Amino acid sequence: MNKLERLIVTAKPIAFFIRKSKQLIIPGFRGIPLFDVVEFFFLQVKKIGLNERAASISFNVIMAIPAACIFLFSVVPYLPVSNQFKAELLALTKDLSPNQNTYKLVESFLNDFFRKSRGGLLSFGFLLVIFYASNAMMGIIRTFEKSISDAKTYFLHKRWRAIKLTFILILLVISCVLLLIGHDALEKILKHYFHLSKSTSLYWWENTRWLLIILLIFLGNSFIYKYAPSVEKRWNLVSPGSLLATFLTLATTMGFSYWVNHFGSYNKVYGSIGTVLVIMLLINLNSLILLIGFELNVSITYLQKQVEDRKAKEKIEKKTSI
């Protein structure tokens, strides 16, 4: 610890916070004090790093997007509400886009997929499409394994897990869009039969669509944390890491959108390619957040194992002393 770090740690407000954090146990931390979790988390991040791993995940996600879209849009025409699905998916994309230019680029990309029929892919190129779409999950699984020293899994087992996770995430997106379609249909009924067009109740109802979007993000993170790591004992679906990652995703997306719209000058400097850079940067930030949530879960699990091992050792020592 250098002189500057010593001055910071010994400062009264910081010392008070450290003292309290050693006594504070947050629900979901399995009885581990906040200070111990934070300390181990930063040591783990310093040892393994985050930036390179986030870049690796980002690359795999970007490369897997076309294949995932081909599969998704090959399934959509078979849904009874395919037109509404398309409109709602574009509306969901608009809600999550940092600015109008980004949305226009994504909208053009999605419309291109919708216009071209790819029904044959469901029978002929299905396995190839799924293979490439699951590369994003494979990248996440490989990146997670760097934090788990005893993670030993065969390639085929990892690939099968990646394919299952890809299916789960695609089903989550489809389910969320279908729920949003139902939400909009119910909103029209409220407007027509109950004349709630300008009421406060309708305002709150319109904003409940954000609850579905938040639920989509949370469940996506939760399923990844539960099934992607190569561990014997799976984490719970609701974990501190998934909650933190969901909060950081929402906060980062909103903050990033505000910055792009008010302070960013990508389009002025790079022209139309600036929009692509915005999308890539947003993917990279969310990859970083995914790793932060994962490392939090790893920290809690590792410290809990240390406590359990220590208790087991003390129990054995007591028996031998008797």
Predicted stretch roles:
Residues 2-322:
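Membrane-embedded alpha-helices and immediately adjacent juxtamembrane helical segments
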